[in-house]
């Protein structure tokens, strides 16, 4: 089946699930995103299980009904078969199948172990919870206190009216049985990135807290292709403000999903749920145990092997929140306990506008502290960071130059993020760039404007523009008013400015003229000025005449 058809069918299924939620009064409710993402994932894991079972036992490949064939299989043989499945496949009981729920949705005679009636919505909820518990070790993420956050929770709890709970769950199961993911499992990152973005697009808006800023795929792909060139294997990738995982997923795809292990932390429960879904869809189940829900700045949870300090990572990417109120934690962050990590300082609490506290400066320092001796990093920062003349921003820039760990900077077009009007740049760090040149690029004039949701304006980069940015940066190629390569000494001579524009050569075009040509040009300019002055006097007279006709009535 063509990829376009698969995409259309998958999006239609997502839309149908959202319609069901709307029909039961759940459209736009806090619980809607949990229902949609959990039901989508239940369907995906169920179909993935059947897909992998066929690969493990070729005799099942031609079964007319794979679920019936599995149900008829002796229990010991079934258990052996599930043990043959890879670690990225959820283990399902025969009663977990979607077909089982579909076939039992109208059976009023079903009873619980204690003999009481077993309403269908309870059967549906119990199935989800049992799948989550059976796969707790593999598919869980964790809190900072190492408590496991399971894969599924009951969904009928979001329907307020008891009589409608079974109807809601029947509508869901009837929709799931119509669709199959069988054709998608051979698809790669680009397909799942598109589907994931479509799935969460209604639930990733206007959050405004840690890392819940959605990073455009263009930015993620630029970062990934600049950071990773050539073969890389057995490396670690980290994002301390991971959000839904766009940056780490793009980087993992560039490295190779089997060649890296992802580590993340984020304070947002919703972001961590989205990230888990994203990792599962992109064959990175082996990294789920490294997804932590907690405050990175106060309680960074990824420690070194001796557990006596923070872990260091080969690659770090992040689009941290730029400004937010962390006044309650400010003094603790500025204490001696964190002094080494926040070497350039911690922003003070302002008397007004606490929401404007520059928290991104702490994330930059945390990333520098967490970078391995040969590590590389890319951080999305407000463009004002590049030229700030004093304070913490300048101290950080001075440190990067002193330690010879700056690879370069790309200043992006305005409104590249639809959610913020702040101009942004990408700061690239490389601990091995001790003696190399630093690449400064001004891509702010690229892109075209488009409306998002009929409201916000966003700048979109074309494929050619993205390629130009990547190729020019990686080649270290100077280009007038676009890209320049400078030395660390050059940067020190410009007060540690990271702005490309301050290093561009100012060019004055000289044209050779004969005395006659010079006289002719000057006469032409004089004639033009005379005409403009005459027109100005005419307009002045006309305005005076019109004013003279104005009378009081």
Residue ranges and their predicted role:
Residues 1-222, 227, 296, 411-414, ...:
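Non-catalytic, mostly N-terminal accessory regions of nucleic-acid modification and defense proteins
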Residues 2-4, 308-553:
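A conserved structural/catalytic subdomain of Rossmann-like adenosyl-cofactor enzymes
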Residues 29-32, 36, 214-218, 266, ...:
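Short, conserved micro-motifs enriched in small and acidic residues
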Residues 43-49, 53, 203, 231, ...:
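A generic secondary-structure signal for well-formed alpha-helical elements
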């Amino acid at each position: 089946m063509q990829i376009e058809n698969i995409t259309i069918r998958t999006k239609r299924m997502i839309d149908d699930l959202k319609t069901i939620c709307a029909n039961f009064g759940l459209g736009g409710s806090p619980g809607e995103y949990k229902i949609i993402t959990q039901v989508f994932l239940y369907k995906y894991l169920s179909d993935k299980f059947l897909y992998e079972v066929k690969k493990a036992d070729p005799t099942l490949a031609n079964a007319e009904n794979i679920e019936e064939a599995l149900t008829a299989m002796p229990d010991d043989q079934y258990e052996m078969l599930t043990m043959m499945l890879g670690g990225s496949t959820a283990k399902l009981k025969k009663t977990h199948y979607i077909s089982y729920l579909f076939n039992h949705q109208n059976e009023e005679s079903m009873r619980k172990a204690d003999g009481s009636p077993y309403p269908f919505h309870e059967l549906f909820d119990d199935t989800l919870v049992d799948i989550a518990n059976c796969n707790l070790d593999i598919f869980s993420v964790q809190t900072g206190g190492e408590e496991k956050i399971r894969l599924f929770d009951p969904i009928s709890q979001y329907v307020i009216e008891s009589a409608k709970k079974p109807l809601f769950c029947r509508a869901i199961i009837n929709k799931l049985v119509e669709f199959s993911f069988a054709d998608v499992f051979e698809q790669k990152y680009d397909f799942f990135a598109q589907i994931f973005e479509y799935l969460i697009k209604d639930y990733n808006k206007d959050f405004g807290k840690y890392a819940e800023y959605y990073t455009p795929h263009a930015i993620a792909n630029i970062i990934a292709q600049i950071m990773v060139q050539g073969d890389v294997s057995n490396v670690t990738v980290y994002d301390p403000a991971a959000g839904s995982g766009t940056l780490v997923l793009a980087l993992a795809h560039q490295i190779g999903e089997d060649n890296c292990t992802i580590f993340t932390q984020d304070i947002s429960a919703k972001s961590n749920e989205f990230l888990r879904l994203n990792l599962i869809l992109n064959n990175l189940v082996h990294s789920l145990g490294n997804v932590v829900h907690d405050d990175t700045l106060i309680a960074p949870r990824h420690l070194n092997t001796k557990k006596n300090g923070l872990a260091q990572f080969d690659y770090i990417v992040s689009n941290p929140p730029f400004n937010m109120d962390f006044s309650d934690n400010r003094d603790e962050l500025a204490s001696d306990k964190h002094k080494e990590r926040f070497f350039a300082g911690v922003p003070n609490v302002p008397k007004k506008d606490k929401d404007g506290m520059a928290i991104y400066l702490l994330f930059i320092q945390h990333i520098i502290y967490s970078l391995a001796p040969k590590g590389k990093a890319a951080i999305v920062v407000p463009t004002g960071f590049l030229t700030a003349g004093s304070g913490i921003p300048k101290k950080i820039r001075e440190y990067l130059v002193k330690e010879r760990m700056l690879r370069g900077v790309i200043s992006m077009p305005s409104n590249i993020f639809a959610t913020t009007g702040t101009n942004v740049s990408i700061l690239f760090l490389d601990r091995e760039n001790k003696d190399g040149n630093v690449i400064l690029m001004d891509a702010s004039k690229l892109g075209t404007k488009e409306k998002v949701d009929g409201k916000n304006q966003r700048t979109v980069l074309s494929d050619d523009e993205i390629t130009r940015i990547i190729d020019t940066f990686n080649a270290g190629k100077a280009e007038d008013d676009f890209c320049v390569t400078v030395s660390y000494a050059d940067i020190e001579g410009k007060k540690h400015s990271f702005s490309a524009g301050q290093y561009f050569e100012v060019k004055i075009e000289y044209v050779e003229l004969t005395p006659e040509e010079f006289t002719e040009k000057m006469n032409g300019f004089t004639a033009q000025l005379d005409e403009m002055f005459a027109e100005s006097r005419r307009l002045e007279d006309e305005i005076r005449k019109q004013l003279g006709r104005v009378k009081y009535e």
